[in-house]
């Protein structure tokens, strides 16, 4: 009983430390943090409550930018309630993360899996691969939920592009599974070393596998094909969200937009892009646009308000076509409808309705895939747009009032989307990041964060179809079914 109690408390400590390391890895980047943290996760698997702590602290640390929601007085929340509401939202996300990871550990404790955990290393590996694939597929599913999801699959970037290159075959879900398998490898080496068991063979096998995986990833990243080039101007508005609807900013914005269009035209751009939410519903340009404009903004369709990417043709003052945001931010843009209750959400513009799920947008400038803000985390949906013919990816966002840590996570997501789809990606955001991400995952910063300005880039477009775009999660699902069949066969022999 005493030994069990000590094991439990050690698991709690290991889960807490692992979660903190995961939080650092997810928010700052760094594969070493993630591998050690996932090693701690495997070490705590016998105790779901310890695994809960891992998920809790991982989310609390990596999502601490949520606290920058405070103050909420600009949308009418009394100052006395502002910080408690921000803390409640932040802590609720942490609880959700902890519960999800604890549920995953409970799956590993069902008899079908549990017998493999206490058997040979080969059988344990089947158990680990199965649970890792389940985790990876769940991450893909969570990326389709209303919540902004930044998981293990995204944590390789920006520091290990070569290993992340494998996403061109099996996407972010496959990378998440790989991270967990590598964490188990680290844990097995530490466990063997502690017990005085042979570990050099396992260490050498893992290192050789890592080298091979990096070589394959490097080859995949080098395989790019481009058909033509576009010259695009990017306008980073740098308007604080809390000041956007002041009389001063409402007067200044139309003039600043016209000045930016003139500057873009003088720089020889084919068209200009402005961030999410730049234009209010019904707002027109002060003068005919000297070049085509793609601008984030709001529009009303059949008494519904949509957050959209609006297209203004050259010589026009009003938009001619649009694609609407599908994935809305809970509380910020959307709240569940209740009888007799009209929710506006935590937004000055009020509630927003979702558009079509497809991110494919075909306009006069050529087909592209559009991600508005958090839609960038759904690689599966963007891959469908690429398969439908999109030649590049445009991500527009407004990440104010959040700090630079969220911008780093957003850029990591942008890198992964570029790698998965073999497409160049442009990110244009209110306060940043405003960058171009090459299909190899390399980042070219165009405008420094928290500065206003217009920058011009040349983007190469492509019609190449990557393995992930073609097959999606089919390889992961097939691999999981095969591993489960092997486990069932071993169970039958036992």
From Swiss-Prot:
Its EC number is 2.3.1.269. It comes from the Bacteria. GO terms for molecular function: N-acyltransferase activity. Coiled coil: none annotated. The active site is at 276 (proton acceptor), 325, 373 (nucleophile). One of its GO terms (biological process) is lipoprotein biosynthetic process. Pathway: Protein modification; lipoprotein biosynthesis (N-acyl transfer). It is an enzyme of class 2 (transferase). Its main location: membrane. GO terms for cellular component: plasma membrane. The chain crosses the membrane at residues 16-36, 41-61, 62-82, 133-153, 173-193, 202-222, 468-488. Gene3D superfamilies: Carbon-nitrogen hydrolase. The keyword DNA damage does not apply. It is found in: Cell inner membrane. It is a multi-pass membrane protein. Residues 235-461 form the CN hydrolase domain. Keywords: Acyltransferase, Cell inner membrane, Cell membrane, Membrane, Transferase, Transmembrane, Transmembrane helix. The keyword Transferase applies. Catalyzes the phospholipid dependent N-acylation of the N-terminal cysteine of apolipoprotein, the last step in lipoprotein maturation. Belongs to the CN hydrolase family. Apolipoprotein N-acyltransferase subfamily. This is Apolipoprotein N-acyltransferase.
